[in-house]
Every structure is written in structure tokens, then in C-alpha cells.
Amino acid sequence: MRALILSDIHANLEALEAVLDAATGMWDVVWDLGDTVGYGASPNEVLDAVRPLAGLTVRGNHDRVCSGISSAVNFNPTARLAAAWTLEQLTDDNLIWLRSLPQGPIEPEPIATGCGEVRVTLAHGSPLDEDQYIVSMRDAWAPLQQMSTAVTFVGHTHIQGGFWQRDHEWHEVRPRYRERRGHGEWTLEILPGTRQLVNPGSIGQPRDYDWRAAFAIYDSEACTVTYHRVPYDVAKAQGRILMARLPERLAARLREGR
């Protein structure tokens, strides 16, 4: 079974379209780790594309605020303005769908493979707290110790990579891409006996100084995660943000990758 892992699309239609095009033929199921909306200028278009595809979606903090479930009191002024704009734009169907999203962590049905059953967890921030940012080994320590499955997929940080632990070994994962025609790719083997936190990165607003849209493919038979980076029409996405009169900073940071 191959899962296309999406996260932090943030209403960036151009980035999502580039990812879906690049991932054609690579997946059997789609898992969305949340923050599908917020910041970007195409919330309905993105939701209309994701809803029929995603087998499982967990909510993110922007999904909660943009749908009116949570207050924006902890958001910075730019994020707060974008969330209010998004709530005004959402169709009734998309608003209902966002409000119905489950809080992570959730576990998909166990996956039968030649090596036995495989269980994984999906969360937005962390398997312990949906709003936790896991950006360092210190952040990863408790989730790796306490999560209920050997592999947990998380988003929220907008940084592609992750962390793994086996016995007394602790490692941070940063992809070392093999580049071809602007598309970066790197495969991580999930070793027996390890516990893995896997972050596919952000599709719509990367913050690891690489502006390209990020996603991952999990192959349960091969026991691998392949990280991908794909270019997209940033100028068009920026133009949508400016046309919507959202803060200019939201457009500028797309090219900066931070």
C-alpha cells in the first residue's frame, strides 16, 4: 500500500496541483495532516480538490480557526486577518466539512503486508498534542517514547524531515535530495525496531528555505518514506493573494520558503 501524505496546503491551489500532478500513479490512498486552509487565497478550490481524494484528514489549528471552531487569539495579526477572510469565503459545504474534521491523533486501519500488519498514526502537530511543534530532538523525545505506533506522520512545522529512535540511538532526518529537472527526491528506509516521526513538509507554505511544494509517499510494503519537492507557479499563487487583498507578506514568503 502506498499513501500520499499531504500537509499544510494552506489554500495554495497552484502548489497542490503541482503535487497531485507529480504524484500521479504513486499512491493508493491519500492522508491529509491538516491546515488545508489559511494564509492562501484559494480555500474553496483546494477543499474541492482534496475532499474527494483524502481517505483520512485530521484537523489543523488553521482549520479550526478558519472554520470558527477556535478563537484566533493566539494567531499573529497576519494569520488572524487571513483566517477571518477565509471564513467569509468558505462555501457552506466546505465549512461543514472543516468543522467535522477529527482531532488527531488517529490511526488508519492496520495495513496487511508480506511482513505482517503495519500500524501508523496521523497527527497535525504531535501524537500527544495537536498544536505541538516538533522542531528539535528535545521536542521529539516524549512523542517518540509515548506514541502508540512505530510510525507517526505529523505536519505543522512546515519543515520536511523528521526524527527516529532505536534503543539508545536518536537521529534527526533531513532529506538529501537527488535533483532531476527541478524535482527533488530522497528515500528513507524505515528500519526494523525504530520509532519514526515523519513530517512530509508543507505543500503551500514551506519554511525550510526551499520554496518548492513538499510531500511524501509512504510505501508499507517496501518500508520506505520518499520525500519529494516539486516546483510550482509561485507567481500565480502570489497574484491570487494580492488580488484578494490579503497581507503582502503572505505572498512574499512563498518565494522565500520561510
Indicate where each model-derived feature is located.
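Acidic, His/Gly-rich catalytic cores of divalent-metal-dependent hydrolytic chemistry
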Residues: H168-R258
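Active-site neighborhood of divalent metal-dependent phosphoester bond hydrolases
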Residues: V46-L47, P52-P110, G116-S148
